[in-house]
Amino acid sequence: MVRRRVIPCLLLKDRGLVKTVKFKEPKYVGDPINAIRIFNEKEVDELILLDIDASRLNQEPNYELIAEVAGECFMPICYGGGIKTLEHAEKIFSLGVEKVSINTAALMDLSLIRRIADKFGSQSVVGSIDCRKGFWGGHSVFSENGTRDMKRSPLEWAQALEEAGVGEIFLNSIDRDGVQKGFDNALVENIASNVHVPVIACGGAGSIADLIDLFERTCVSAVAAGSLFVFHGKHRAVLISYPDVNKLDVG
């Protein structure tokens, strides 16, 4: 059985690392290069790096910072934020990044996924979905760092992304972001069991037990977390960590 992955998810804002709660209240937690050096030592599976301002502010990716990060990273990187064209993706790949995560741009022009996949392969494209539960209980997809309701169901959009050519889906629960009270297992399983590409679940990890619970209750392929690997203790002191994934009793 293929071991399921455990992936740190780092958020970039103004060249610094931040952590949010429900996509709000970004708190500075350190320098990205220092964090990556620590994760190198801990031999993490891979790394997801998301610029939370780029798409919302209609900015291009920060290629200089991406190059610095890629130069330090010993593990595969997935980068997202501000990628709106094939040329943006091509530039990022040329800097040594293995995957790009496309979110808002795909909602504006789904053909971007196919163009990137056709040129670089589906394995290089991750379709990112930010979703929030509505008043009546259903979930809706949001764009522009969770500020715009696209009035689409996460499952419908996940299937559209799969058909367009993504190699993976990154499913991020806005409601659970930074709360550290467990994943929305029902949401994750609904998506993971109805698409044929790997799904990475993000949003809610507060303990190793939460990771194990998600893996045991769903068919998700990987889990991503931020707060779990950045904060320590009830006062949320900044302390970068990573579990011994070989001790996670899951396949």
From Swiss-Prot:
- This chain's source organism reads Pseudomonas aeruginosa (strain ATCC 15692 / DSM 22644 / CIP 104116 / JCM 14847 / LMG 12228 / 1C / PRS 101 / PAO1)
Q: Which UniProt keywords apply?
A: Amino-acid biosynthesis, Cytoplasm, Histidine biosynthesis, Lyase
Protein name in the entry: Putative imidazole glycerol phosphate synthase subunit hisF2
One Gene Ontology term from the biological process aspect of the record:
O antigen biosynthetic process
Disulfide bonds, paired cysteine numbers: none
Q: Which domain of life is it from?
A: Bacteria
The gene that this protein is the product of is hisF2
Mutation effect (L110I): In strain: Serotype O16
Catalytic residues?
A: D130
The annotated subunit structure for this chain is: Heterodimer of HisH and HisF.
EC number, UniProt record: 4.3.2.10
What reaction does this catalyse?
5-[(5-phospho-1-deoxy-D-ribulos-1-ylimino)methylamino]-1-(5-phospho-beta-D-ribosyl)imidazole-4-carboxamide + L-glutamine = D-erythro-1-(imidazol-4-yl)glycerol 3-phosphate + 5-amino-1-(5-phospho-beta-D-ribosyl)imidazole-4-carboxamide + L-glutamate + H(+)
- GO cellular component term, pick one: cytoplasm
Q: In which pathway does it act?
A: Amino-acid biosynthesis; L-histidine biosynthesis; L-histidine from 5-phospho-alpha-D-ribose 1-diphosphate: step 5/9
